[in-house]
From Swiss-Prot:
This is Cochlin. GO terms for molecular function: collagen binding. GO terms for cellular component: collagen-containing extracellular matrix; extracellular region. The lineage of its organism: Eukaryota, Metazoa, Chordata, Craniata, Vertebrata. Residues 128-158 are annotated as: Disordered. Residues 165-350, 367-537 form the VWFA domain.
Amino acid sequence: MWASWIPVLCLGVCLLLPPEPVGSEGAVPIPITCSTRGLDIRKEKADVLCPGGCPLEEFSVFGHIVYASVSSICGAAVHRGVIGHSGGPVRIYSLPGRENYSSVVANGIQSQMLSRWSASFTVTKGKSGTQEATGQAVSTAHPATGKRLKKTPEKKTGNKDCKADIAFLIDGSFNIGQRRFNLQKNFVGKVALMLGIGTEGPHVGLVQASEHPKIEFYLKNFTSAKDVLFAIKEVAFRGGNSNTGKALKHTAQKFFTADTGARKGIPKVVVVFIDGWPSDDIEEAGIVAREFGVNVFIVSVAKPIPEELGMVQDVAFVDKAVCRNNGFFSYHMPNWFGTTKYVKPLVQKLCTHEQMMCSKTCYNSVNIAFLIDGSSSVGESNFRLMLKFVSNIAKTFEISDIGAKIAAVQFTYDQRTEFSFTDYSTKENVLAVIRNISYMSGGTATGDAISFTVRNVFGPVRDSPNKNFLVIVTDGQSYDDVRGPAAAAHDAGITIFSVGVAWAPLDDLKDMASKPKESHAFFTREFTGLEPIVSDVIRGICRDFLESQQ
């Protein structure tokens, strides 16, 4: 029964018609905020009014044409071209959930991919009403009940003491089954909630291991615990073999990229849940993860009983997959029942950043100084080939103010610091400076140059956590002793790679190089032969770095 009746004159006959319900065609559009989501509108069809001037960061959009209900309505409307950034009326239609929401750039908005969601919506041009869009976000009336919704709260910053990018790699195999799969999701949800997810805290995503790995959602998809919990709940059981190794390798290689939300300088973590044992080899996947700087935690549940051990490819699979076999990265629960008491200890591990040893790699935790021969025997054109050699090594590393650092010194009888470790913190700037180094020309005093570099370049960073390397490139015999200065550099913890060209004596190269000499000293007859040595030096740096971390 309608609460009131409105007289309407039609062809001379006065009729009593009920007023249109809120949200129906012809009704005044309901004002909403920039971040109001499709799931906040609980009608099959509703007319809403989007404000103008919404910041793009409030437009969280998943899909194209058909959008997941967790998407911003106004963001979807701008994305589809229904309205512009000045706002306006929008009609929203509720649709069933689906799989594989696509990622598309449209009208200045990048929508995100989502593997599955329980409800969807689409948008069309709405009917204009008496309300007008403004640049101000307003409180919204709830279309289903007529109650006022609370103003959308600001995004939570999260636990700043637990900054980490975390992928939960859950077991979706027939090993675990549907019932224990749901218990696993509940446990992961509790861990996610306790972590303190937020814009400046931990970010999480989820991958399901089964016959083929499936990334359920990425780090960038959700930055609130509420949305993460909802997304975890929506993950469907896949079944198949527990190819955990395949899934771990896929996660290490594809999950932690800038495009998917990985942050610079933040520890990368994969928490692998294994019910029983994996169906494939997990050791190689662990090696790949370490090479990518990913900290692998293994949460094993229900160890195989003696009668099942013959079915396990490698009973030591946990020790071979984790970041370090020191007990910190492995975690065991007897079963999936009564797991609440295991949540806090796991969270404490995930938030202990000083233990995240695999975040440090040879690519982001080294200081590399290049000592470049600028003597007269080199010549301008060959000097440029030397600089190309230096650039090709430098560009391999993750140069930043918290990552790898590069310095360069040119020497003849004299020495000139081209740039120090603290001068440039981006790869682009470092490579540009190397290209523009001018050729000095003069004699060759390599010993003095080593002492100068140790004192003036490495001295200011002696307390740096990065491992120190010196790459010497020379084309001739030094007029001074190299043995003493090189030994002093070794004693100072600096690993030396010596690279000789043309007339450089092999004895000098070996005297300067760190041990074992055969893997730290290189020689080529021609300057064009420097290029193949690039990969040898990079491999050597990474090998020495890994050995120093054992």
